[in-house]
Amino acid sequence: MDLIIASRMDEASMLMAEKIIDLYDFNRLNENEYQKDGFKLMFIDDLHIYHNMEKLDFDTLIFLSRHSSSAGVKSLTVHSIGNYRKAELGGYDNKTVLSAPYEMSSSLRSIKELYNDDGYNITFEATHHGPYTKNRSYFIEIGTSGEDWHNDKILEIMARSVIEKNVKRFRSGIGIGGGHYAPKISDYFFNNDINIGHIIPKYVSETIKDNQIIESIENTENCSFILIDWKGSPSRLRSLALDAADKCSLELIKI
């Protein structure tokens, strides 16, 4: 069973949760919990990025969330959880958590299939922020304003991409390089039968340590490759990726 988590401090999170409950007729267990088939939905009072948790008896945790963009870019995104530097938005410094490459990638693939317009950027984001969990987990987000969060068509797409996603067990790997939205990694993903877990962006290239890349590999289930945006990776990050691929006997895919 998977656990869907909605924060009462996040309007988009609440709206997505309400759409899931209504669309799939979830059964109310109590004021904070609903359930249907292989999913439980839980409301929390604090902001999800700060809601650290010990190991829970669920397969995957799915956090519903708003997405913020200083540029106002309309986006539908998914991303793994953790920090490659100081934890300014939840979690722990320099620590990633277990990603969910099969489920997260399948949610993004579902969004892409269901949304056939040009109004939103559909993409991975690099691994960032909290909370710290001991379960496989990922965020699914709507950005970037109230207009987007209240868009009924978008809410239905996101709900369906959580509940109805067709989980494909393609081989999984991590991404390295590029900006926060990892455009080349996302494009390659949509055109190849792969799944992605953690993504390490170029903006951490000067401070990331080799053990953090190894941890990202270990926290990506059945990781078999590193997908690297070669031109979008400074020389230090390229070198660390090459070393990690060699140490962990992974295929290095340059794009």
UniProtKB/Swiss-Prot annotation:
It holds the Pfam family tRNA_deacylase. SUPFAM superfamilies: AF0625-like. It comes from the Archaea. Its cofactor is Zn(2+). InterPro entries: Deacylase_DtdA_archaea, DtdA. Keywords: Hydrolase, Metal-binding, Zinc. PANTHER family: D-AMINOACYL-TRNA DEACYLASE. NCBIfam families: PRK03995.1-4. D-aminoacyl-tRNA deacylase with broad substrate specificity. By recycling D-aminoacyl-tRNA to D-amino acids and free tRNA molecules, this enzyme counteracts the toxicity associated with the formation of D-aminoacyl-tRNA entities in vivo. This is D-aminoacyl-tRNA deacylase. It comes from Picrophilus torridus (strain ATCC 700027 / DSM 9790 / JCM 10055 / NBRC 100828 / KAW 2/3).
